[in-house]
Each structure stands twice: as C-alpha cells, then as structure tokens.
Amino acid sequence: IADLSTAAQNQTYTVRGVITADYRYANGFSGFYVQTPDTKARANISNAIFVYIPNSSAVKGGQVGDEVILRGRLTTYQNQLQLDQLQQDIQTCNSNMANQVQPISLELPFASLTGGSTHSPQRYQGMLVKLPQTLTVSENYNYGRYGELSLSLGRLYIPTNLYPALSPEAKALAQKNLLSKIIFDDGYNNQNRTPWLPTNFSAANTLRSGYQLKNAEGILEYRFNGWRVQPVLGRNQPEVITQTNPRQSVITKNANHIRVASFNVLNYDNGATGFP
C-alpha cells in the first residue's frame, strides 16, 4: 500500500491489507480503510488507504479485522488518496487479522503539516492511531452540528490577544497553534446528530471547552481542509475528564449591589406581522 503514494493516478491497482475501519453505514463515508499489517509495513510513510464504495455500488465483502485483496482505481479526493471504481467483490484472505494492525502512537505537536517531515500528519494518513497525551478541548463550536472537537496541548490563545498584530511573536504563536491541535470527529457525514461524548450527553452533562480527553484513537485522515481522527466502531471510546475546568458556584446576591440586565432584539423575529 505504501507504494501507492508515488504511483501514477487514474490507473488500476491491486492491493492487499487489513480492514481497520468500516464506514459503510447510514450517513457514513461510503467506504473503509485498509492498512498493511505491522510486520510488513514500511517506516516513515503511510501504509493505509481509503477504499470508496458508493451506496449505489453492488460491490460487497470484507469487515474490520479481515485481510482482503481488492482492485480499484487510484485517485485523489479532498487531498486524500483513495481507491474507487471497484468492479469485483472484496476477497477475504484471512478473517483473523485484527491484532496484526495496532494503533500507532501519535503525539502533538506536529513538526510540520506537510509531507516534508517524518512527524507530519501526512506520514500517518489513513492509518490507525492513538493519541496517548491528555488533550484539552480547545474548541467545540462545531460539536453540536458536525460532531467535531478541536483537541490541543492545553488551551490555545489567539495570538493578537498576547502580541501586536503581524508581530513575529504573533506569527510564531499562530503557527505553533496550528501544529498543536487536531480535530476529533464523530465518524458520520451528516449534520445535527446527537453528540456522542460524554456518555449520556444532555444539557446537564455537556462537553465544555477546557475539558480534557484521554486515550482517543481512530483513523487519521484529511477531510474538509483539516486533519482529524475518526473514531472506529467497536474500539475504546476516549475518557472525558471534566474536573479540570470547574465552574464557579453561584455568587450570593448582595442587596446593596445593582444588577444590569439587557435583552438582544437583533434576532427577535415574530413572523410575518412586521417588526417589532
């Protein structure tokens, strides 16, 4: 599989590897990842690739843990190599290979976001990885809609909050922030799903910025202009640590203090009866 990184595209190739993650389910990614067993893997290069099988395809076969042989066209989609246009069912060679591909330890920060470094995300693209560090939820803006969390080494600060705009220090911190974070996704392709972390998610049990995650693992991929880890069904879920960002208790009201209240009418829409 590693040879595909330099192979001519729009050509047909036959590959053999172990299925590490299968996203052929409703609102999934219509395909799966296949990776070379650890004993045959090459160093400092990706040993995995995504196999795209659209919902309209009649091709079937293979499940997580199977070593398979398949033949497809090599192409690039959203800056990620993939095999598509499979014409035959997937052939299973060995159905007991799940333990032959172990997650690779992936630590932040990256040395680079391009392929010029042995510790760049491109080096691990499509592979099964684990994040051994305790990472902080630095952004949850897209969590409710897309199931995305930005994880980082500690809290990240906007560079111009600390340094003058366009200063060398601000530019250096901006670059450091980019190398020190990664998106942890939910493995689905549709919007507005029920958030899956923490367990029993609710208004009283939500996931806030400043919380931490331990032992996250999944497939490292590039999607929607960002490096992210997609969870794998059946593998361990990350541990959510909430005690690191405690909320202040309610302050007792002082009768001598004045409280100021306001009401935002910017989005106070009351139908077709005019405004207000």
Regions found by a protein language model. Name each.
Residues 1-276:
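Extended non-catalytic accessory segments flanking core domains
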